[in-house]
Structure formats: C-alpha cells, structure tokens
C-alpha cells in the first residue's frame, strides 16, 4: 500500500514552518514563514530547469534547507548590522534563510554559476530580501574584496583546509569564518591551514536539526591579516591543500 500524502493549504504550510523553527528554539512570525513558503515554491519550480537542489519535498526543504541554514547562527554572537558573505552559495543556503530571520544583516551571495545567480536575484526580489549577488569565482573575488566582511560562511562539502582558503581572506581581522560541516570531518586537522590564513579555531560544536540529522559547526576567528599569496588559484587550492 502506498503511503498517504498529506497536502497542506497555505495557512497550514505557514504553521508548519513556524512549528519546525520552534523545535529548534527559533521564533519566527507569520510574515517570515510566508517568505519561506514562497521561497520553497519558487525554488522547486525553478529547479525543473536549473539544478539547484535534490531536496524538493516541502517538509524536507523546511527542515534540511531552511532550519538547517539558520540554526547554527543562533549559536554564534552576531552583532546587529553585521556584513557577511556566503561563499559558493548555490541555491542561496545559508544566506537567504539567514536574511529572512535577520534582516538587519548585510548579505553578499557569491556563486561561480551565472544561472544560479539569476535565480538568486529573482528569489530575493520575490520575497523582499535585500542582498548583493555576485557572479564570480570565490578565489578571484577573495582578492578583490579582501577583509571586507564581519564574517564569511559556507555550507559546503569541501574539506576544511580548502574551504578555509576560499573563505578566510574575505574576513576582517577580528571577524569570523562560520563553517557548516558534517560531523564526519575532523576540524582540528585543519588547524595548521587555518593558522597560515590568519585564523584560529574558536569553537567546534556538534548539534542536530529537528529531524535528528547530526551537524558540526566550526567557528574560526580571524586574528591576523591573510598573507597576500592567499587565496591561490582554484587548481592549487583543491590539488595542493594547505
């Protein structure tokens, strides 16, 4: 027998979003929840023509993309009005959900694929999220916008030494690189690479999203300027990690 599929109307979907965030001790209002509903619908529709995500079922999008993007930032002290860059943002995670919940932040989203950047522009306009979308390779942008942001973030599968070289150059001295990682990665193994880039490991914290999936948060503090030779070109970053 096939499982019965429950179809929710718009008000029920709004309530569902609010309840899933509440499970993570995050309070959002109906207006914010409605933005998440609209974002999900738009992303799933757009995904038919541009590869954005393999997760398209509403309840899974809410937990595995939306809550997953916001929850780790509740564990870090982020002052009002902070500027940040989401490096290799893809479909806009974690940046867009974070900006829905923290509209005081000044977000820049960087991606190397123009098709995704077009989607990001349209998605942000649709739900009324202010952001700067930049089509660029992150290692090239990291030389142009060097030490310009209060924090950088990435929700990526790349190993921590690779991710650190892409992200830490963007961060002001005294700022943070907030990495959203899987629990399988040993963050301490990247401490040497992080030090070469002007950072030090401040916090590593394991947690779970509402469905029980395990996650690891790594917070890197920028304690000195990144040497001008970093970031290297992408071939060296990935083939010869620090």
Predicted regions span which residues?
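SAM/dcSAM-binding transferase cores
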Residues: 188-242
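Short "lid" loop at the C-terminus of a central beta-strand within the Rossmann-like core
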Residues: 139, 159, 182-186
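Conserved SAM/SAH cofactor-binding pocket of Class I
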Residues: 67-156, 164-165
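Residue-level signal for inorganic ion chemistry
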Residues: 43, 98, 120, 181, ...
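Helix-to-beta-strand junctions that scaffold the AdoMet/dcAdoMet cofactor pocket
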Residues: 102, 171-173
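Conserved beta-strand signature within the Rossmann-like core of class I S-adenosyl-L-methionine
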Residues: 174-184
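Class I SAM-dependent transferase core
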Residues: 2-81, 85, 115-130, 135, ...
